[in-house]
Regions:
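Transmembrane and membrane-interface helices of multi-pass
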Residues: 17-252
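The feature marks either
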Residues: 229, 236-241, 245-283, 290, ...
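Alpha-helix initiation and N-capping motif
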Residues: 39, 135, 145, 237-241, ...
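Solvent-exposed soluble domains appended to multi-pass membrane proteins
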Residues: 270-632
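N-terminal, intrinsically disordered charge-dense segments
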Residues: 2-4
Length: 632
């Protein structure tokens, strides 16, 4: 009998628990994997406790449900992180060199640091952006580190760095005492081929959780969506996986958001583009001249919630409320995205914001975008851009120059004594400079001036103290700067031939949080000036991308190259508001207000008399946007 058992052991090399050195390595492998899973799982309740105001109604069971449903991403990322330790364990079966131990120490030290950075950055940014970490901050930081950090205070950054170091230290201590320190060092096994083969199979098996199983779909964020409450779904997301997934899906635009076959998308999209006016004179004229001077005032983070006109906060944007009555108000207007770089492209080029990237990242693509400035330059307009901050932030300068703007006034054009804001020159300084230039310089008319404000942005530190609420006070300050400028400009002879386009770059900061995603995109669009025929309210549904076609149509200029822009005043064109964020798109018409979650691939909100009417149209619109992005 002993001979038979000995023969079985000899013939069966995978009798794993017969060999101490093999057992040690397998236990080490499994410990490494499940330790990563445990650490990722514990991050979720920490996130929820940190944002306890958002999760105030969450029960203890909700915490466990979030951890349970978040496991697929945790298991997947743990698989990625265990692969290298698995290979090192295989190597340890062939050599006991101290080099392997040093590699393990460096590897786990690096992983501890990366995990800490991602978790703390995600923890800090979620309160500002409302979605888990993706690759977006990398673009903002490297385009202008100063501006990327301007939204937060020095102490916020310092505390974040300290938290990263402490968390990284805690993680490394855990890794050291559980994985790195060897009380009984593993020896080179007698049957090293068998040990290596067993560990190789285990390492290869990591492909299963990494991929998410054997089904057709691979691991993605939708795997952890389980609740109708988006806050619960957000808590279940592993921020490190979200960041990695976003970073590796930045450029393959032609493969992203494939909802339907190309022919179906083409047919649906053809019904959503601008149409020839029928009859030709059916478009009402808003201006009393065809070549007015045009001043765009792009308001940082403004929204309808700040205006009493829309039922928002009274006594905040008092000048905007005044202009809404004196000028032309578009009352059902939407921001196309959630950040300045996406908002600028929507306003200036009629190009919708993208959920997974920003076209501003790719100067070779923005070079090929149509733009209002270029169209007006060809019509004889003089172009200038004014901004109190860094014009290089998010590649804005390259975009503006490629749009035909020759004169760019930015932070470097103001003396240091006037750059007192976190973002550079405060708004009142910006408008004083603009007014001074307009008075002193011999203005070549007609002109287009793009003015971008910055003070109504985190950290909301402004030289103005009318309201107790810091955030509302910053918006009231920006509003007062616009009001004072327009009041003084009215005294200039250019007033009678000028139209001001007042539009936010996106909505943000107030109120917070916003539960309904539709409420997070509503912004005002107001036209005012001496070139306006008469005040009126236009209730057509539209968004920032429609400004280009509408304005150029009023000037009698072609706008065919603005593929996604529609004339808001054209009764023959389809009208809708469209917007995207990193995890959803929305399409809004009087009949249907729809939001589709791109992570979960499910309808998040569906209201109106014709529920679901905008679902396929919204998908086709996004698919065609990415087709266009891939070609540029």
């Amino acid at each position: 009998m002993r001979k038979i058992r000995k023969s079985i052991v000899t013939l069966y090399p995978f009798n794993l628990f017969k060999f101490t050195d093999m057992k040690k390595r397998i236990i080490q492998f499994l410990t490494t994997y499940f330790l990563f899973v445990l650490l990722f799982a514990l991050q979720k309740p920490i996130f929820m406790v940190y944002y306890r105001e958002l999760y105030i109604n969450a029960s203890l069971g909700d915490y466990f449900r979030v951890m349970w449903h978040g496991l697929p991403l945790d298991l997947s990322l743990a698989g990625y992180l265990t692969a290298i330790p698995g290979l090192l364990l295989i190597a340890s079966a062939w050599t006991d060199s101290s080099v392997l131990r040093r590699i393990r120490q460096v590897y786990f030290g690096l992983i501890a640091f990366i995990m800490a950075c991602i978790f703390i950055v995600d923890l800090g940014l979620y309160g500002f952006w409302g979605f888990r970490l993706d690759a977006t901050p990398i673009f903002y930081f490297f385009s202008s580190p100063k501006d990327a950090m301007a939204s937060v205070s020095f102490w916020f950054v310092l505390l974040g760095i300290v938290a990263m170091l402490i968390y990284a230290g805690i993680l490394y201590c855990i890794f050291y005492y559980v994985l790195i320190r060897e009380k009984n060092p593993m020896k080179i096994p007698y049957r090293r081929q068998n040990v290596s083969l067993a560990l190789l199979l285990l390492t290869a098996a990591l492909f299963i959780p990494i991929r998410g199983g054997f089904t057709v779909s691979t691991m993605n964020l939708s795997k952890v969506y389980f609740s109708s409450d988006q806050l619960m779904n957000h808590a279940a997301i592993n921020p490190a996986f979200s960041f990695m997934y976003s970073a590796t899906h930045q450029n393959n635009f032609e493969k992203q958001y494939r909802f339907m076959d190309p022919n179906t998308a083409d047919k649906l999209f053809a019904k959503m583009v601008d149409k020839p006016a029928t009859p030709a004179d059916s478009i009402p004229q808003l201006l009393n001249t065809q070549r007015p001077n045009i001043v765009f005032i792009i308001l940082e983070s403004f929204s309808t919630h700040l205006m009493e006109t829309f039922g928002g906060q009274p006594n905040v944007a008092v000048n905007m409320d005044k202009f809404a009555k004196e000028g032309i108000l578009f009352s059902n207007f939407y921001a196309n995205s959630f950040r300045t770089d996406r908002g600028l492209a929507s306003i200036i080029s009629g190009y919708p914001g993208q959920p997974s990237t920003s076209i501003m990242k790719y100067p070779e693509k923005t070079d090929k975008l149509p733009s209002i400035p270029r169209s007006l330059k060809n019509a004889g307009y003089n172009l200038e851009y004014y901004y109190g901050g860094d014009a290089d932030f998010t590649n804005m300068r390259s975009y503006l120059v490629s749009s035909g703007i020759g004169k760019i006034i930015c932070d470097k054009d103001f003396p240091l004594s006037e750059r007192t804001g976190k973002w550079g020159a405060q708004d009142h300084v910006l408008f004083q400079r603009l007014l001074k230039d307009m008075k002193e310089e011999k203005q070549q008319e007609p002109f287009l001036k793009l003015v971008q404000t910055s003070s109504s942005h985190e950290p909301f530190e402004v030289p103005f103290h009318r309201l107790d609420d810091k955030v509302l006070n910053a918006f009231a300050y920006a509003d007062s700067c616009v009001g004072d400028f327009i009041k003084q400009y009215q005294e200039l002879p250019q007033w009678k031939n000028t139209v001001f386009v007042l539009v936010p770059d996106h909505q943000g900061a107030y109120p917070y949080p916003i539960e309904n995603p539709l409420d997070g995109q509503t912004i005002p669009l107001i036209l005012i000036g001496g070139a306006i025929k008469e005040p009126r309210v236009i209730d057509t549904y539209a968004s920032q991308i429609d400004i280009a076609a509408t304005l150029l149509s009023q000037l009698g200029l072609p706008h065919d190259e603005f593929t996604f822009s529609k004339d808001i005043l054209n009764p023959s064109s389809p009208h809708f508001g469209y917007f995207t964020r990193p995890n959803y798109f929305g399409m809004v018409t009087p009949e249907n207000q729809l939001v589709y979650n791109l992570d979960a691939n499910t309808v998040q909100l569906d209201e109106g008399t014709e529920k679901g009417a905008n679902l396929e149209k919204g998908k086709a619109f996004l698919q065609k946007l990415y087709d266009d992005l891939a070609k540029r």
